[in-house]
Regions:
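Short helix-loop boundary/capping segments
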Residues: 181-183, 365-384
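C-terminal/domain-terminus segments
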Residues: 423-451
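Short beta-strand segments enriched in hydrophobic/aromatic residues
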Residues: 214, 358, 372, 428-430
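Active-site proximal loops enriched in glycine and acidic residues that flank catalytic Cys/His/Asp
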Residues: 247, 314, 367-372, 416-418, ...
Length: 489
């Protein structure tokens, strides 16, 4: 009943809403009123509801109890959540928000106050590839003027991950906040590594700090930095040790600005693989996704490998010019050992340049080259040479001249198209020294193979053997037995 003092007896309310993109919900309130008017009297109620949250393909429900007594509204119990949240390849299982302390809103004209504490709990969060975030809990407290202006503080835990400390404020239009991730061991993030990677995180520490804001017209924006120190990860076929990674970033309007005052920095002490690489450095700065107006630039790439060094001064995306990879003093003996070639052995160093294209209709590498830095040697494996001579009598004499050769000059042209077809054209000049006999050798070698198949099979030595068998010709003999060979004038 309704009197001059307000509503007495049972009081109910039902709220329904629907929005095309966000979804729909229905909320019921049912309780007992006693001389109730807004900010006067008392209305005790329980509430419940349900709905759908379309952007994340989720069903929503809520229930709880509370009261409105004079100018104070109190939520004494609350349980609300989703059956799941799905966004892209991420799936959060059964997230639920409950009260740690009652939420109390004092609607006083001179001294309004909003207080309370909540806990957001979720079961496992899964990602593509089988990686996951363990069951997590975010506990936070509210303190402010009213639901349109309050501050919050809290912390996020996910088993050994965290705590990530949070603080911020809501002013009715914009949510602003900060998150601090204190330094902790890299090993606690093992669940986030997909099992198919077979990667074991062993050492290192990680810490981060992020500031963020969100508003209806602005969307979500964030900026901050993350730091990885002394990281180490082992896999069945390789080890990565001594990783230092610094990531300053901003995110706005769907774009990442990587590197603000300083570029993103990657330093790796050692990569142990079929080829061991050491002292890798690389810097990255720019926008992702990139555009002509806002490019992304990789710079100052350097790594020590195969007794020499590989460098790349700059790679700009979108790409206007090829990025020049320089090879300096690469050991041919270390290279042939790394790819496990048994048919021949080489010694000596080579240098070269590989113009790299990532945005080209035809080429990945075009007009690359290699040359010898000084004297080199080529020695055919005895069993390989003997087998070639036995199987091909006409080529046998030529093969014998190539059993051991000192190379004075070599030049190799390298092309790799975007279908993976690698083309090598080599010109080699040198002296054959076999059984005390010296002869000048001019060898032209051409080879073509899909490099993806080559990486899988590592059959380079077998292919060279087949080419020698089919193309070897007898070198011109320039001297008599036992005498030093000389070029004719």
């Amino acid at each position: 009943k309704v009197t001059q003092q307000g509503v007495d007896d049972r009081l109910q309310a039902i709220l329904r809403a629907h929005e095309q993109q966000m979804g729909d919900f229905t909320l019921h309130l049912d309780g007992q009123a006693s001389d109730f008017l807004p900010d006067s009297g008392r209305w005790q109620w329980r509430y419940w509801g349900e709905g759908h949250f379309t952007p994340m393909q989720a069903r929503w429900d809520v229930k709880g109890s509370g009261e409105w007594r004079d100018n104070a509204i109190t939520l004494s119990s609350l349980s609300t959540g989703f059956d799941k949240l799905e966004y892209g390849t991420m799936r959060v299982s059964t997230p639920r928000l409950t009260l740690e302390q009652p939420i109390r809103w004092l609607r006083d004209a001179e001294h309004p106050r909003l207080t309370g504490a909540l806990s957001l709990d979720a079961a496992k969060t899964t990602f593509s590839g089988g990686s996951y975030l363990p069951a997590s809990t975010l506990k936070f407290a509210l303190d402010g003027r009213d639901p349109t202006w309050f501050q919050f503080t809290g912390a996020l835990h996910a088993e050994a991950i965290g705590p990530v400390r949070l603080s911020g404020r809501w002013d009715g239009e914009r949510l602003r906040g900060q998150a601090w991730w204190p330094k902790q061991s890299l090993t606690v993030f093992q669940p986030l590594v997909p099992p198919d990677w077979k990667m074991n995180l062993r050492e290192g520490s990680l810490y981060a700090q992020v500031a963020f804001s969100a508003a209806a017209g602005q969307g979500f924006e964030a900026g901050g930095h993350g730091v990885l120190k002394g990281g180490s990860a082992w896999m069945p076929d390789n080890q990565i040790n001594g990783v230092d990674f610094v990531l300053p970033f901003r995110f706005s309007d769907g774009h990442w600005q990587l590197g603000i005052r300083r570029p993103v920095s990657l330093r790796i002490g050692e990569i142990v693989n079929q080829v061991t690489a050491r002292n890798l450095t690389a810097d990255l700065q720019g926008t992702w996704p990139w555009s002509e107006a806002n490019p992304l630039q990789l710079s100052d790439v350097s790594v020590d490998l195969l007794g020499g060094k590989l460098t790349l001064l700059q790679l700009r995306m979108p790409q206007r010019d090829p990025a020049l990879i320089r090879l300096q003093h690469i050991s041919s003996s270390e290279l042939t050992s790394a790819v496990k070639v048994k048919q021949f052995a080489m010694s000596g160093a080579v240098s070269g340049a590989l113009p790299l294209w990532l945005e080209n209709n035809q080429w990945i590498i075009h007009d690359g080259w290699l040359r010898n830095d000084g004297p080199m040697t080529l020695r055919l494996d005895k069993d390989t040479a003997d087998a070639l001579v036995a199987d091909n009598v006409s080529a046998g004499a030529a093969i014998n001249w190539l059993r051991y050769m000192e190379i004075s000059r070599s030049w190799t042209q390298i092309n790799l198209d975007n279908l993976g077809v690698l083309t090598l054209k080599a010109s080699i000049n040198g002296t054959s020294r076999v059984e005390g006999k010296n002869s000048t050798v001019h060898l032209n070698y051409a080879h073509e193979e899909n490099i993806f198949d080559l990486w899988r099979s590592l059959r380079f030595g077998d292919n060279l053997q087949a080419w020698l068998e089919q193309n070897a010709t007898l070198p011109v003999r320039r001297c008599t037995d036992g005498k030093t060979c000389k070029e004719p004038k």
